[in-house]
Amino acid sequence: MNFPQNVKYTNEHEWIRLEGDVAYVGITDYAQEQLGDIVFVDIPTEGETLEAGEVFGTIEVVKTISDLFLPVAGEVVEQNPALEENPELVNKDPYGEGWLIKMKPANAADLDNLLDAEGYKAVVNA
């Protein structure tokens, strides 16, 4: 299982990586492995400002639909257009081409309250 050091993690298995004033958000390798084959990603919140922990979309696998939770407060500015035709990118490359949204965090310092790779490993292995 992959635990990149350059991202922050949530207990709900999302990750966030800040690049300038925009952050990429996705689900973790552990989450995609537990979910199985992803068949559809729905992000209806593009352009909306949400609070940390609010649902920003859903991921559909063969047997279930799972909510996606925003790691920090901010505006959802873009969804990954590649996922419309290729939702399996989330399974193949969850920290790269399989990112879900780009967002503008309301306060970048909020990322400091999230888990680092070691903290997230402890959650997964608990």
UniProtKB/Swiss-Prot annotation:
N6-lipoyllysine: residues bearing it: 63
Alphabetical list of InterPro entries matching this protein: 2-oxoA_DH_lipoyl-BS, Biotin_lipoyl, GCV_H, GCV_H/Fam206, GCV_H_sub, Single_hybrid_motif
Ranges where the Lipoyl-binding domain occurs: 22-104
Biological processes annotated in GO: glycine decarboxylation via glycine cleavage system
Cofactors required: (R)-lipoate
CC per GO annotation: cytosol; glycine cleavage complex
Cofactor note text: Binds 1 lipoyl cofactor covalently.
Source organism, top-level taxon: Bacteria
One Pfam assignment: GCV_H
Keyword annotations from UniProtKB, A to Z: Lipoyl
SUPFAM superfamilies: Single hybrid motif (SSF51230)
Family membership: Belongs to the GcvH family.
Function: The glycine cleavage system catalyzes the degradation of glycine. The H protein shuttles the methylamine group of glycine from the P protein to the T protein.
Quaternary structure and partners: The glycine cleavage system is composed of four proteins: P, T, L and H.
Entry-linked NCBIfam families: gcvH, PRK01202.1
Name of this chain's protein: Glycine cleavage system H protein
